[in-house]
């Protein structure tokens, strides 16, 4: 492959006291690709997100972003390095406008610091334009976010992360708690971001069907360790099902249910 990875993780270990949450995790994520990170509850995906996002410092290992070794100790450091994380709660205020949620503390101000006025027309224009780039045309950027569908709110959070500099986009179960139509909206948004070609996407999901639809690569975690990885073209449906089950064979699981 000619492309260089945007993020490289080698032998990442994270311990909480005597408990090892991540044990020697390695993976690479390339621009223009969706890298699905799959695992059951307790697999370590949430801990990995928090390490990459600067919430938890790693215990040992190496993380490179765009070829540079990093060691995040705060979320701001991760954000400044170009890592944008969209959590399940989205960090949106349902009662305020789409535009205010898009900027959320980074408003465009004209005039002296502390006395300036927000440039609402320009902020509305940017919000509408950035949402449109990844597939959502909003009629009124001043509508409350609470009037948007779940899929549209996900798109808003993704567009916001990209506009403010994310080159590595981490999506934490973006289709969970959504209806089927809204799930497809979100998957279409992710595909549009992928087609931009310059953003690496880490998709955390428990839904193997969604992963099969949009992922280019997979990494499977179980109990904090990588139990399998590969290109989507290399892994068949049975491989994915087996690795989603923690490496167990489907037949063995069926026998266990009969006991």
Regions found by a protein language model. Give the residues of each.
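Glycine-rich phosphate-binding loops of nucleotide-dependent enzymes
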Residues: 2-259
């Amino acid at each position: 492959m000619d492309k260089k990875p945007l993020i490289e993780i080698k032998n990442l270990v994270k311990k909480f006291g005597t408990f090892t949450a991540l044990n020697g995790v390695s993976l690479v994520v390339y621009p223009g690709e969706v890298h699905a990170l799959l695992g059951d509850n307790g697999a370590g995906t949430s801990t990995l997100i928090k390490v990459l996002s600067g919430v938890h410092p790693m215990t040992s290992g190496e993380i490179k972003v765009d070829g540079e070794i990093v060691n995040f100790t705060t979320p701001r450091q991760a954000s400044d390095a170009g890592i944008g994380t969209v959590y399940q709660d989205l960090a949106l205020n349902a009662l305020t406008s789409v535009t205010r949620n898009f900027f959320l503390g980074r408003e465009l101000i004209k005039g002296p610091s502390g006395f300036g006025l927000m440039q609402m027309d320009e902020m509305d224009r940017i919000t509408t334009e950035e949402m449109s780039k990844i597939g959502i045309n909003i009629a009124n950027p001043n509508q409350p976010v609470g009037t948007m569908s779940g899929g549209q709110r996900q798109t808003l959070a993704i567009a916001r992360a990209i506009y403010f500099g994310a080159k590595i986009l981490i999506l934490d179960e973006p289709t969970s708690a959504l209806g089927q139509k809204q799930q497809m909206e979100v998957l279409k948004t992710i595909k549009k971001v992928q087609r931009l070609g310059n953003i690496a996407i880490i998709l955390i999901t428990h839904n193997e069907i969604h992963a099969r639809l949009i992922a280019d690569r997979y990494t499977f975690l179980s109990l904090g360790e990588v139990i399998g990885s590969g290109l989507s073209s290399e892994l068949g449906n049975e491989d994915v099902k087996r690795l989603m089950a923690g490496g167990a064979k489907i037949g063995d699981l069926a026998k266990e249910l009969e006991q």
